[in-house]
Structure formats: structure tokens, C-alpha cells
């Protein structure tokens, strides 16, 4: 005999996606119509950041195994997600400065500056900066995840490891400074020139890394322009300098060696 309770517990679209929890996670703090859009857009960003971090961790595994084909497929997915992330700025820009100002005070000290997932992404890209930990209580999940990402090999470390599996003589590379990104290395650039001149799969992987770097920089640019058009030069809600701070993050490549070799090709 079939247990009647089995039907009530059967998996559904809603239960599989946890839609009851997901759709109840938007809790505006004002009666302003536009606050819901603000919340939804930022929650969607966080979901995409989660997926990008997930894919980049998988990418590192493939690179460590020397699996260039799998790495290229994963990079294609990440790049497609980044294009979606950038395009979502168009949605938030339908909100006028007046519409945002109407509920901005209700955000109190909450700020995108506090996005732990984006800090993890930055750490995976190679940023090593203990100041990134400041907004997160020691012992908390955000603090632990960012610290672990900064202690782990960066994406560029994984790329160099992959190149070594392909027979290229990868030299030791300098460590990133205590507050910043790893400096360029002429020794690494000589190896990258060999990679590009061989014009094989490894060169394609390097090119997709350039696309990744460019995609993140494009996101940063669209983000700062969105902030400028919404709040001008006002300070950020979390105490940051707002657009002024965001401008300082522009045009800093995560993989400077891949850019430096282009003039010598």
C-alpha cells in the first residue's frame, strides 16, 4: 500500500528551489515602492557572486589537473555570468536619485561594501589585504571565508601551475604585498611569451584569463557610474567614501603580467 504521506512530501518545483524561503527574504524597511527593486537586484547579485565563486573554485581544480579543455568551458560560463551581472546595472539605473533617497536612510550602515562574497572573489583573483576583514566579526562566517580565500592559491597561481603541467618552465613568483595585488614579474612574462608563441590550448586559457580580468574591470566601471548617477559624491551608507572610493578600484588589473606581454607579441 502506498503511504499517503509520501505524496505530500513529494519534491516540487517550489520545494526544490525553496521558493517559500526565497520569496520571503525580501523585507523592505519602508513603504517606498522602489525599495523592493533595490533589494531584489542586490540579492540577485549575491546569488551570481555565489555561483562565480563556485565556478572559480572548480576552475582551479581543473587547472591543477592540467585539464585545459574543462578550464576553458568553465571560464566561458564565468564570463557569461559576468556579462549578466554587468547588464543588471541597467535595471537598478531605472531608479532615479530621488526614488533612492526616499528610502536610503532606512539602510542605516548597511552597504555593498560589506559583501563578503565579493571580497572572497577579490581574494581568489589575487587581492591580499587584511583590511578586507575589518567589516566582519572575527569568528564569523564572512571573516573566515575571506581569510581562507586569502590564504589559498590565487587564480593566477593556479594558471601558473597549469602552465607547468603543460611543460613550461614556470619560475618562482613574488608574493602579493600585505595590502594589494601581486606585482608584475618579468620572469613570468618571459614564460607567458613562450606560451603565446606556441599558440596552443594554453594560450587560449591565458586569453580567457584576460577576458576574466576585463570582465571584472567592466563590472567595477559600471558599478561606479551607477553610484555616481544615483548619489553623486555622497559618502556610502557603510561609511566608505562612496563613488570616490570605488574610483580607486578602477583599472587595477588582477593579472598584470598577462597585460604586460601584449606589447611584445
UniProtKB/Swiss-Prot annotation:
Q: Where does heme bind?
A: 223
**SUPFAM superfamilies listed in its UniProt record:** Indolic compounds 2,3-dioxygenase-like
| Key words of the record | Dioxygenase, Heme, Iron, Metal-binding, Oxidoreductase, Tryptophan catabolism
What is the required cofactor set for this protein?
heme
Q: Per UniProt, what is one GO molecular function of this protein? A: metal ion binding
The EC code for this enzyme is 1.13.11.11
How is its cofactor bound, per UniProt?
Binds 1 heme group per subunit.
Which superkingdom is the protein from?
A: Bacteria
Q: Name one GO biological process term.
A: L-tryptophan catabolic process to kynurenine
Q: What class of enzyme is it?
A: oxidoreductase
Detail which positions bind substrate. 38-42, 104, 237
**Nucleus among the record's keywords?**
no
Instruction: Name the pathway it acts in.
Output: Amino-acid degradation; L-tryptophan degradation via kynurenine pathway; L-kynurenine from L-tryptophan: step 1/2
- Determine if 4Fe-4S is one of this entry's keywords: no
Chemical reaction(s) catalysed: L-tryptophan + O2 = N-formyl-L-kynurenine
Query: What HAMAP family has UniProt attached to this entry?
Result: T23O
Record text on subunit structure and interactions: Homotetramer.
Q: Which family is annotated?
A: Belongs to the tryptophan 2,3-dioxygenase family.
Q: What is the annotated role of this protein in its UniProt record? A: Heme-dependent dioxygenase that catalyzes the oxidative cleavage of the L-tryptophan (L-Trp) pyrrole ring and converts L-tryptophan to N-formyl-L-kynurenine. Catalyzes the oxidative cleavage of the indole moiety.
- UniProt name for this protein: Tryptophan 2,3-dioxygenase
Which organism is the protein's source?
A: Anaeromyxobacter sp. (strain K)
Amino acid at each position: 500500500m502506498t503511504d499517503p504521506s509520501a505524496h505530500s512530501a513529494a519534491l516540487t518545483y517550489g520545494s526544490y528551489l525553496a521558493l517559500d524561503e526565497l520569496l520571503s527574504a525580501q523585507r523592505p524597511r519602508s513603504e517606498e515602492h522602489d525599495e523592493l527593486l533595490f533589494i531584489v537586484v542586490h540579492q540577485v547579485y549575491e546569488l551570481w557572486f555565489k555561483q562565480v565563486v563556485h565556478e572559480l573554485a572548480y576552475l582551479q581544480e581543473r587547472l591543477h589537473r592540467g585539464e585545459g579543455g574543462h578550464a576553458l568551458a568553465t571560464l566561458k560560463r564565468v564570463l557569461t555570468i559576468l556579462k549578466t551581472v554587468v547588464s543588471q546595472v541597467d535595471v537598478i539605473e531605472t531608479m532615479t536619485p530621488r526614488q533612492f533617497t526616499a528610502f536610503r536612510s532606512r539602510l542605516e550602515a548597511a552597504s555593498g561594501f560589506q559583501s563578503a562574497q565579493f571580497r572572497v572573489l577579490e581574494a581568489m583573483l589575487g587581492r591580499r589585504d587584511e583590511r578586507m576583514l575589518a567589516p566582519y566579526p572575527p569568528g564569523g562566517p564572512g571573516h573566515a571565508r575571506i581569510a581562507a580565500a586569502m590564504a589559498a592559491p590565487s587564480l593566477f597561481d593556479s594558471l601558473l601551475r597549469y602552465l607547468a603541467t603543460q611543460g613550461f618552465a614556470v619560475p618562482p613568483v613574488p608574493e602579493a604585498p600585505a595590502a594589494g595585488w601581486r606585482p608584475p614579474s618579468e620572469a613570468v612574462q618571459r614564460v607567458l611569451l613562450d606560451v603565446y608563441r606556441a599558440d596552443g590550448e594554453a594560450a587560449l586559457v591565458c586569453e580567457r584569463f584576460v577576458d576574466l580580468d576585463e570582465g571584472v574591470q567592466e563590472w567595477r566601471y559600471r558599478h561606479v557610474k551607477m553610484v555616481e548617477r544615483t548619489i553623486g559624491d555622497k559618502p556610502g551608507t557603510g561609511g566608505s567614501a562612496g563613488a570616490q572610493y570605488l574610483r580607486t578600484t578602477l583599472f587595477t588589473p588582477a593579472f598584470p603580467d598577462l597585460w604586460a606581454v601584449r606589447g611584445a607579441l
